[in-house]
Regions:
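Cysteine-based protein phosphatase catalytic domain of the PTP/DSP
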Residues: 3-97, 117-147
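The feature captures the conserved acid-bearing segment of alpha/beta-hydrolase catalytic domains
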Residues: 148-152
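A phosphate-binding catalytic loop at a beta-strand-loop-alpha-helix junction
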Residues: 94-113, 117
Length: 153
C-alpha cells in the first residue's frame, strides 16, 4: 500500500483494537524477511483480509480470510462475521489486535466495525469512529457501509 503523506500503516481505533493496511513489499510476490523468534511483536493477534499479504511472524496468532474490496458477496458474509467474532474475542480478552487488509480502509473497516457493533456500538457510531481514527476514506466502499447500516448486531 502506498501511504498518504500523513497516514500511518496502523491506527488504534480503541485501546487494543487496531486497523491497518499491508506495506507494498509485504506481499507474496516479494521475499519475506521474517523477524527473529524473540523480537518484540507489535500485536498479539492479527486478522488478515488481504489474500496476498505475507503471513505474520513468530508467536503471533493470525486468522486469514481474503475477500475482494468490491460488491459484498453474500457467500462471504458467514466468514466475515466469524472473523469479526474472533477479533472481538481476542480484543476483549486483553490482546492487542490488528485487523488488516490492503489499504486499511474497507475490508479491515468492515470487520472492525462489526467487532465494534458486537461491543454495543451502532453502525453509524462505529463508522464515524473508524473514519476519525483511521482515515476519512475508511469504509468508502458504499456496499460495505450500506451493509453495516442495514444490520443490527
Amino acid at each position: 500500500m502506498t501511504l498518504l503523506p500523513t497516514q500511518e500503516l496502523y491506527s488504534e481505533i480503541l485501546p487494543g483494537l487496531w486497523q491497518g493496511g499491508t506495506h507494498d513489499f509485504d506481499t507474496l510476490e516479494y521475499p519475506k524477511q521474517y523477524p527473529i523468534w524473540n523480537q518484540e511483536k507489535l500485536f498479539d493477534s492479527v486478522a488478515t483480509l488481504y489474500a496476498v499479504a505475507h503471513p505474520v511472524g513468530w508467536g503471533i496468532s493470525e486468522r486469514r480470510f481474503g475477500f475482494p474490496d468490491s460488491a459484498l458477496d453474500e457467500e462471504n458474509l458467514p466468514d466475515i462475521h466469524a472473523m469479526a467474532d474472533w477479533v472481538y474475542e481476542e480484543w476483549k480478552s486483553g490482546k492487542k489486535v490488528l485487523v488488516r487488509c490492503q489499504a486499511g480502509w474497507n475490508r479491515s473497516g468492515l470487520v472492525t466495525a462489526l467487532a465494534l457493533m458486537k461491543d454495543g456500538q451502532k453502525a453509524k457510531d462505529a463508522i464515524d469512529l473508524i473514519r476519525a481514527r483511521r482515515s476519512p476514506h475508511a469504509l468508502c466502499n458504499a456496499d460495505f457501509a450500506a451493509y453495516l447500516n442495514s444490520i443490527c448486531e
